[in-house]
Amino acid sequence: MLRALFQKTGNAVYISHLDLMRLFQRAFKRAGLPLTHTQGFNPRPSVSIALPLSLGVESQCELLDFELETDTFSNEDICTRLNQALVEGVHVLSVYAGGGKIKNLAYLDCAVLLEYDAGVPQNAAEQIEALFSREDVTVEKKGKKGVVEQNIIPMIRKFSATPVSGNVLKLEARVCCQNPSLNPMLLGAAVNQYLPDLAPDFIRYSRVEIYDTNETIFR
């Protein structure tokens, strides 16, 4: 089994998880890289993506696991061939063997850009940091069983808010990503819910890095 580290940026953030899977399957075929298939009545290509992204979220650290029918291709060749077959915004950074077990993924760093047409409100960073220093910030979360209320604070390891321009405030957080997991979009939802006067005109989300249970970069 091999693993690819790839980015998903630009307009590609609007490609759904299922469509991204299909995109990669087609890319392997166009690149002349034959994937193995699962056994059984409905064989499927041996390819999977860890920690599916929400629609509209950018990422610098996505992981794709796959298995080829042959070992005649070098990792560098696989990387080059895939990038030639993929769409703009989906870019493979490296291909390697011997990656960590996905079950050991525990945390991720995310960036949330709050954009204000009329400029970042005065003391916004201080008010938002005060919000996330509380013991309880409960927001609504959509799950398989419907909408539930969830206190997101126990799933936040680090948090900061910093103005990066006159119109943009950057939230940076390290959050749990498995068992339990916190969708970074809930950070923006919390600002809108608890600090409506600081609700931004637009929010951009990005996954920056992923870590194991020891908070070591995961690959």
Language model segments and positions:
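Short, charge-patterned binding micro-sites
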Residues: 36-66, 99-101
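Short beta-strand-to-loop capping motifs
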Residues: 6-8, 66-72, 112-118, 173-179
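Ordered, amphipathic secondary-structure segments that act as subunit-interaction surfaces
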Residues: 59-113
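Extended, well-folded interaction surfaces typified by the phenylalanyl-tRNA synthetase beta subunit core
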Residues: 5-7, 11, 15, 19, ...
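Ordered, soluble secondary-structure elements with a strong preference for glycine-centered loop motifs
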Residues: 14-18, 72-77, 122, 177, ...
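Core RNA-modification/binding signature centered on pseudouridine synthases
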Residues: 133-219
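Short amphipathic alpha-helices in soluble, non-transmembrane regions
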Residues: 76-86, 123-132, 187-188
